[in-house]
Amino acid sequence: MQAQKLEKSLLWEISGNGLEKSSYLFGTIHMTCDASLDDNIKIALDNTTLLVLELDMDDPNMQTEMMKGIYMKDGKTIKDLVNEEDYELLGAFLKEEIGMPITMVGNIKPFFLTAMMYPKLLNCTVQSFENELIKVAHEQEEEVLGLETIEEQLNVFEAIPYEDQVTDLLRSAKDNMAYDKETFQKMLELYDAKDLEGLNTMMMEDKNLSTTKHKDVMLDNRNENWIEKIEGFSKKQATFFGVGAAHLPGDNGVINLLRKKGYTVKAVL
């Protein structure tokens, strides 16, 4: 079943197929300048009794678990992945951007080093929709759970070869993040326009990102694994799901996968 073209919305109602109450699916962006929640999101949060994000961000062990998984396996370091010239370039770049010498951070997976620089892509104090959603859940005294464990999420990054991860980092170093800034701006514009189709096209066409090259690992496989959990939670109680917007559109996106299972998934406009 091919995905129908999606209306411009970030909030979707899941109903039918034996569900007693509707659940809601909201596409987040993990970093933005303004993460205020629209009225229709607040209403959906009022009508649900559980918040489920990609990860259970209320888990007190989250940081510790995350720290365990940020290092490359088998004692590998960036020095093993690049030539001398690129190593020096990366050294200067990391010192400038995160204030640490490469000898200290060289054993961290390149993906995480790239992620440490994400806040620099925005000229503002970074806000996150996940944090705003958690605040509301706490006010409503509701539980916050996750669709995957930290371990499962870390395995995703383990499945992408370190060579590909370091290629992304090198590109950022070579153009001083100009490409990243431009791409992220485009992504924010599409997100603010609630244009999931546009986001999907951008992800599919951006040959520079290892996320595109490894879309199956980053998005598709995870979406597939989440469906059973989304069903399980929704059957028990009205649930509000908040996941990265890139997971929603496309043939293998969460919206189409739920429709294939027989659920009605409609845009809340």
Predicted features along the sequence, with ranges:
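Bacterial Sec-dependent N-terminal signal peptides
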Residues: 1-7, 12
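A conditional alpha-helix N-cap/helix-loop micro-motif detector
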Residues: 4, 34, 219-223
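A generic structural signal for short, solvent-exposed coil/turn residues
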Residues: 4-6, 17-18, 45, 233
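Amphipathic coiled-coil/heptad-repeat helices and related helical stalk/stem segments
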Residues: 7, 37, 129-130, 223-226
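Tryptophan-centered motif/residue detector
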Residues: 10-12, 191, 226
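Structured, acidic catalytic/metal-binding patches in enzyme active sites
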Residues: 14-24, 29-210, 214
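A cross-kingdom marker for long, charged
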Residues: 212-269
